[in-house]
Amino acid sequence: MNQLIKTFTALAVLLTLYPQAWAQPKITWDSKSLLVDGRRVVPVMGEIHYSRLPEDEWESAVKNMKAGGVTMIATYVFWNHVEEQEDLWDWSGSRNLRHFLEICKQEQMPVVLRLGPFCHGEVRNGGIPDWFFTKGIKSRSEDPRFLTLAEKLYRQIFTQVQGLQWKDGGPVVACQFDNEYRGKGSYLMALKQMAQRIGFDLPFYTRTGWPELATPVPFGEILPLYGDYADGFWERSIAPTAGNYYKAFFFQPNRVNDNIATEQIKYDSVSSSSAGKGRGGASYPYFTCELGGGMMTSYHRRVYMYPNDAYAMAVVKLGSGSNLLGYYMYHGGTNPEGKCAYLNETQRTMATNYNDLPVKTYDFQAPLGEFGQANSVFFRLRPLHRFMHDFQETLAPMVAHFPNTAQARKGDDSYLRWSYRSDGRSAFVFFNNYERLQHLTAKKGVQFHVGDVTFPSRPMVIPADAIGIFPVGVAGIRYATAQLVGKEGGKVYLMQVKGVPVEIAFEDGKVIRNGKPRGTGKPIYKLYYLLTIEEAEQMGKTVKPFSHTVMEKVPFERKREAGPLRTITIGVNKVAEEPTDADFNQAAVYTISLPDSLSPDALLDINYHGDCARLYANGKLIDDNFYNGRHFQYGLWRLPKNTQKLELRILPMQKDEPVYFPQEADTTPGEGINSIKILSR
């Protein structure tokens, strides 16, 4: 199969157009898309935080992202990761940005650097060092004292980037200034001018398109990128469906949603009046940088994500006109050890004290987890990413149309949600019958009307939770109720959307009804192949999940019962506070005995229940977990050699905690270990 189906490549159109590899074409943009030497591309951007991964895992992480269909990487440069102590810069080890960029160059993976100075990313103070707050300077302002410090940061970053910009043959194609900024556009312009003065010279520059700026930046100077999430750990509510996240599952022309950063941004109204617009009616392309590839668990809100959460949202954004899907996060990580303090966001920190996040883990339930685990959503997204690459020149110029203009309402089950994108000759129909934590029923009597084409020939049923994209007038297909996946060497690959009957009408007059998948070995007609979703998810070079059990029962022993239950206090931002180090001194303590030898990819899998847990090696905290029903996992390859014992501390679940737990969590008061295994790929 690997000979039949090409492997995903980084910003793959570059390699298609320039097989000598990594020749630097000209990258531009217009109101529709990015262009590479004039040819339209529809990238998949995946966020990974290089400083949240050990340096020796970067290469495999980038390769695995590429295998998932990611064609561009985004990463924050956290100020307090590299200057935690004033004037003591640390670009070593996991903070070695230059080495990370060199790996991206080696792997032909373009990079967007999110420079800050403010980043957020659930990092302590949003990435701004503690020492800054002793100076009495207003952050994120045009105060010359702040800009002087920002310039020092940018100059330091440039020492890492120099010679690795796109114009140099390097991977850095763009940078983002600040993050979720709502003040005057002149501040962002000051950062851009500063960066260019230092030496940054990139094909394009970006900002987050939310919230609305108090005053705009001149059109064309900085591209706004948007985002959306299926749920948010930052919501104050402990109800299952807090906020307006249902809007992420409706096709709509509005690029700005009021779901992001609601703990810090008060949205008076959400309007698309200025979103993507410039002087004289010119407009920006619809790009995203923060589509929730997963979601973190905060202490007060233990969100549990499902594969269709990210998949449905991605299809909806693509069907709403987006020509760059940027996931936050695509690869999870672990907070590095701080020199002065923990580096996670908490309600006790001086800034970004909105939520309590785990001290160490930043797994994010992402497609690739904290230790590179290929989660179900990784495979769910792969066929979509292949489609975006192989049909990008057809898709990119297409305009989005919205047949149903009803206002989005939570759980609205009265109609099938759909849109189509068309250039007047060809089209793609996008539909979504899924909404997170809502039951949408099967939709009967469905036919789509696009131009002069009505299909299928007879009304059909779209099952509950079905999500898909149907071609009209593309690749020799007049219409199909199957989803295009890819094309290669004259062959065209489609997949059946689960539960949807397949009807394919070809331009030559041939019609196939009730088509059945035959895999990649046997065409359904001429050079057309019909696959199952599972076959499409495994096409080409992929990443093996941790599915092999190396050790069924890892020995463990309870060394100490839990002490008195802690009092769960409400913090400054009106949500429950996470346990302190002192609280964990009262936790139940278990000793885990490891085997004498371990495979290089041994993953510890702890099935426990309780409020939260911490894992220690030789007395040092190495990872932690806010319980939400998923297993607590740890990559044993990160341990010092000859580590024989680990210590697990679990705080008991309490009755009626002021915390949202999903239905997958065991909320029985108390704590315990169900099993501990060692897995491998």
Task: Label the model's feature ranges.
Residues M1-Q24:
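Bacterial Sec-dependent N-terminal signal peptides
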Residues W22-M72, E102, N674-I676:
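N-terminal carbohydrate-binding accessory modules
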Residues D37, G451, E507-D508, Y616-I622:
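Short strand-turn-strand beta-turns centered on an Asx-Gly dipeptide
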Residues W58-R124, K192-R197:
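Aromatic-lined substrate-binding rim segments of carbohydrate-active enzymes
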Residues Q106-V112, C119-Y267, S272-T297, G319-S322:
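Active-site region of glycoside hydrolase catalytic domains
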Residues K135, F146-Q160, D168-Q176, R182-K192, ...:
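Carbohydrate-binding surfaces of carbohydrate-active enzymes
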Residues D596-A617, N625-F626, L648-R649:
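Aromatic-lined ligand-binding clefts that engage carbohydrates, nucleic acids, or primary amines
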Residues L648-D656:
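Short beta-strand-plus-loop segments that form exposed binding edges in beta-rich domains
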